[in-house]
UniProtKB/Swiss-Prot annotation:
<feature type="binding site">
    <location>
        <position position="206"/>
    </location>
    <ligand>
        <name>Zn(2+) 4</name>
    </ligand>
</feature>
<feature type="binding site">
    <location>
        <position position="31"/>
    </location>
    <ligand>
        <name>Zn(2+) 1</name>
    </ligand>
</feature>
<feature type="binding site">
    <location>
        <position position="191"/>
    </location>
    <ligand>
        <name>Zn(2+) 4</name>
    </ligand>
</feature>
<comment type="subunit">
    <text>Interacts (via CHORD2 domain) with SGT1 (via CS domain). Interacts with RAC1 and RACK1A.</text>
</comment>
<keyword id="KW-0963">Cytoplasm</keyword>
<dbReference type="GO" id="GO:0031267">
    <property type="term" value="F:small GTPase binding"/>
</dbReference>
<feature type="binding site">
    <location>
        <position position="80"/>
    </location>
    <ligand>
        <name>Zn(2+) 2</name>
    </ligand>
</feature>
<feature type="domain" description="CHORD 2">
    <location>
        <begin position="169"/>
        <end position="228"/>
    </location>
</feature>
<dbReference type="GO" id="GO:0005634">
    <property type="term" value="C:nucleus"/>
</dbReference>
<dbReference type="InterPro" id="IPR007051">
    <property type="entry name" value="CHORD_dom"/>
</dbReference>
<feature type="region of interest" description="Disordered">
    <location>
        <begin position="1"/>
        <end position="23"/>
    </location>
</feature>
<feature type="binding site">
    <location>
        <position position="64"/>
    </location>
    <ligand>
        <name>Zn(2+) 2</name>
    </ligand>
</feature>
<feature type="binding site">
    <location>
        <position position="45"/>
    </location>
    <ligand>
        <name>Zn(2+) 1</name>
    </ligand>
</feature>
<keyword id="KW-0611">Plant defense</keyword>
<feature type="binding site">
    <location>
        <position position="48"/>
    </location>
    <ligand>
        <name>Zn(2+) 2</name>
    </ligand>
</feature>
<feature type="binding site">
    <location>
        <position position="63"/>
    </location>
    <ligand>
        <name>Zn(2+) 2</name>
    </ligand>
</feature>
<dbReference type="InterPro" id="IPR043316">
    <property type="entry name" value="RAR1"/>
</dbReference>
């Protein structure tokens, strides 16, 4: 009887807590944040729903038309759409660039004016426009009384930096947040060379790695270590 009473009075073991989901990195373009399934509310992800366009040195997001010549500033353009984080890579289609309109070339001699005719401009006789005297180009006369005064160069004011202030590194391929007190000569992993976009090929000139897809380009690891720089050009 005492054994049955002890068994009845014993407390049941508490259920084991559910294992926490491992953090994952969002694969949406322009986000790159880490998240868990337990902490992924709607609106927590800010991203670009469509891919970039590259034409004549200009970088532009096809979804929101935001553009920049500088690649670091282009990547810093915030996403134009919000939603939930995801680990699925988006399928981006290459956006064709608009071909430049060809300017028709005038081949008829009758359409060429005397001011653009090569023979008239050189002072030779031209059967289409008659004899045209060569235009006299006025020569600029220097005024000896006008002496240019050189203004002394004003040095830029020195910027005061708080060692504990969070700053964002603008080195290409980094983009991390850091504090100046933790900065050192191996704190930053970045690409020193410019990005190369040519014939649908994307890559870095510094490490000579080139790929076709923009997602693969963003995953090229940096090739150089150095100091974080929040004022990089």
């Amino acid at each position: 009887m005492s054994t049955e009473a002890e068994t009845t009075s014993a407390a049941a073991p508490a259920p084991a807590p559910a294992p926490a989901s491992a953090p994952a990195r969002c694969q949406r373009i322009g986000c790159d944040a880490t998240f868990t399934d337990d902490n992924n509310p709607d609106g927590s992800c800010q991203y670009h729903p469509s891919g970039p366009m590259f034409h004549d040195g200009m970088k532009q997001w096809s979804c929101c038309k935001q553009k920049s010549h500088d690649f670091s500033l282009f990547l810093a353009i915030p996403g134009c759409k919000t939603g939930k984080h995801t680990t699925e890579k988006p399928i981006t289609k290459a956006v064709p660039t608009k071909p430049s309109k060809a300017v028709p070339v005038q081949t008829s001699k009758q359409s060429v004016g005397a001011d653009t005719c090569s023979r008239c401009r050189q002072g030779f006789f031209c059967s289409d426009h008659g004899s045209q005297p060569k235009a006299q180009i006025p020569t600029a006369t220097s005024d000896t009384n006008m002496v240019p005064v050189e203004k002394p160069a004003v040095p830029p004011p020195k910027k005061k930096i708080d060692l504990n202030e969070p700053r964002v590194c603008k080195n290409k391929g980094c983009g991390k947040t850091y504090k100046e007190k933790d900065n050192h000569d191996e704190a930053c992993d970045y690409h020193p060379g410019p990005a190369v976009f040519r014939d649908r090929i994307r890559g870095w000139k510094c490490c000579d790695i080139h790929v076709k897809e923009f997602d693969e380009f963003m995953e090229i690891p940096p090739c150089t270590k150095g100091w974080h720089n929040a004022d990089a050009a």
